[in-house]
């Protein structure tokens, strides 16, 4: 049977989501799998919606795992996966919280059924830096910026494009993505001035893409790059060394959207299939991040 997890974590002290072979590096996946395997007395292997990098946080992460029915028959669970929330709450470290566990709907795949991922990037340009209470999720940029310039740079990136200039290379993976939303907002307050948030939504993101999108807009916002910088990067055929990558600490995965229950399997099959970019001469395998 398939179980769905809804979870959150502070990525500060993790080496990203993915476990790294036999390494003892602390990753979110390793900590969760170790604890789930101990509770359920079965080997658990997680599939996740967004494989976040080192230092990146999540408030709305989704994962799934498959397990035999008898693993839930122990007295403390009694066949009800939601009871794992309390068990895990007692075992997991303070920087991971599983806030929902339930039977997955037929055809559900945390990664391939996803329609879109929502990220928020939070950054301050104030010389004092972030508030101590927001130091883990707010990055610092060394120069002041103009919000209007950043938004124009972001608008130029919306739609279906090859974002190779903004992505770190990964074998057999396409860099074609549909960027559905890229909106900047001034969220400053009297006690926290010069703070900005970028809300970024796409069907999927390739490795380091969100932080590269943010860094490029910040470069335009501070005047280091011209207003057409981001649009020009869409014509690139490889990753551009001119693209600054914003710090990991400002980025949080805040949500994952899925289709209705009757469309879950169809969506998973579509995502797994070869996706062809209209202007490309070859088809590439989609590899969601």
Swiss-Prot record:
Q: Which CDD domains match?
A: PseudoU_synth_EcTruA (cd02570)
- Which Enzyme Commission number(s) are on file for it? 5.4.99.12
Q: Which residues bind substrate?
A: 119
According to its UniProt entry, the protein's GO biological process terms are: tRNA pseudouridine synthesis
Q: Which reaction does it catalyse?
A: uridine(38/39/40) in tRNA = pseudouridine(38/39/40) in tRNA
Per the Swiss-Prot or TrEMBL record, the active site comprises 53 (nucleophile)
Tagged with keyword Iron: no
Q: What class of enzyme is it?
A: isomerase
Q: Report any Pfam family annotated for this entry.
A: PseudoU_synth_1
Q: Which GO terms describe its molecular function?
A: RNA binding; tRNA pseudouridine(38-40) synthase activity
**tRNA processing as UniProt keyword:** yes
Keyword vocabulary terms for this entry: Isomerase, tRNA processing
Q: What does this protein do?
A: Formation of pseudouridine at positions 38, 39 and 40 in the anticodon stem and loop of transfer RNAs.
Q: How does it assemble?
A: Homodimer.
Q: Which family does it belong to?
A: Belongs to the tRNA pseudouridine synthase TruA family.
Protein name per UniProt: tRNA pseudouridine synthase A
The record lists the organism as Corynebacterium glutamicum (strain ATCC 13032 / DSM 20300 / JCM 1318 / BCRC 11384 / CCUG 27702 / LMG 3730 / NBRC 12168 / NCIMB 10025 / NRRL B-2784 / 534)
Gene that this sequence comes from: truA
